[in-house]
Amino acid sequence: METSHNQELVATILEDNVANELQTIQDFLRWTYSILNRSDIYFGQGHDNPWDESLQLVLSSLHLPIDLPTELFNSRLTPSEKETLVQLVLTRIEQRVPVAYLTNSAWFCGHEFYVDERTIIPRSPISALIQDRFEDLISQEPNHILDLCTGSGCIAIACAYAFPNAEVDAVDLSVDALNVAEINISRHQLEHRVFPIQSNLFENILGQKYDLIVTNPPYVDEEDLADMPEEFHFEPELALGSGSDGLNITKQILKQAPDYLTENGVLVCEVGNSMISLIEQYPDVPFEWVELKNGGLGVFAIQRKDLVKYHDLF
């Protein structure tokens, strides 16, 4: 929804005849940064500040790398490039469309992924654990990994990079999301190690056991879902909401996971703000709440033996 403040900003942009006044990449970076800074928009879907969003919007739309050498910032733009950039900025502030959807690009664990509105935008704090190869959480290098609720496939693909000898199954209920995951698996040339599977959680996984299950399931409770900024309404609700306490799907995973873990297997799960409700409901369960280097919260690890021990609670 466009606010009155954003409407005034749009009017100013149109009056300023920006495409004629600005010439270089640096001009457009500065202008985009200023506009996003002044706008009534939300940051938090891949980037938490207007400068990083500006870099992605400008450079990605020009088909340039995010680490473009600064000496190229003085390169002049063509009229069509300038018009494209102005329209993208207008769409960002008028419609509140996330930058990742405007550019069909998001970054996770240092890798670029294709994204569109069929899947949520990669931003899981699990990225910090993947980059540390789940140090102190697993006792040996995993041969078989499951990414449950894979969405764009970013966690599965990042795990495949982190563990070059592992095979990774990427499971999602949504066929649309899996189509996006397949694009990313192909782009990263990992078809021989990352396998997309359409399944309602474990339903279509037959006989396979995993050394590591990683999952970022829907976990937003009804109250938070209703209060989310406009940008989140572009993401598929199926991938966000999970009942009144945000834990409907997580509870199913906790109950079923031990049947799909090897003897020393580990479940790593993100529940975000719903961690408070999870702790309150299961005070005796030894969830290991992981301290994340990137500042995120709400990620726990739990051993298979503990899932078995407390199985009847879930």
From Swiss-Prot:
The keyword Methyltransferase applies. InterPro entries: DNA_methylase_N6_adenine_CS, HemK-like, Ribosome_uL3_MTase, SAM-dependent_MTases_sf, Small_mtfrase_dom. GO terms for molecular function: nucleic acid binding; protein-glutamine N-methyltransferase activity. Signal peptide: none annotated. GO terms for cellular component: cytosol. Its EC number is 2.1.1.298. Keywords: Methyltransferase, S-adenosyl-L-methionine, Transferase. It catalyses: L-glutaminyl-[ribosomal protein uL3] + S-adenosyl-L-methionine = N(5)-methyl-L-glutaminyl-[ribosomal protein uL3] + S-adenosyl-L-homocysteine + H(+). GO terms for biological process: methylation. Pfam families: MTS. Methylates large ribosomal subunit protein uL3 on a specific glutamine residue. Belongs to the protein N5-glutamine methyltransferase family. PrmB subfamily. PANTHER family: 50S RIBOSOMAL PROTEIN L3 GLUTAMINE METHYLTRANSFERASE (PTHR47806), RIBOSOMAL PROTEIN UL3 GLUTAMINE METHYLTRANSFERASE (PTHR47806:SF1). This is Ribosomal protein uL3 glutamine methyltransferase. It comes from Haemophilus influenzae (strain ATCC 51907 / DSM 11121 / KW20 / Rd). The lineage of its organism: Bacteria, Pseudomonadati, Pseudomonadota, Gammaproteobacteria, Pasteurellales. The gene is prmB.
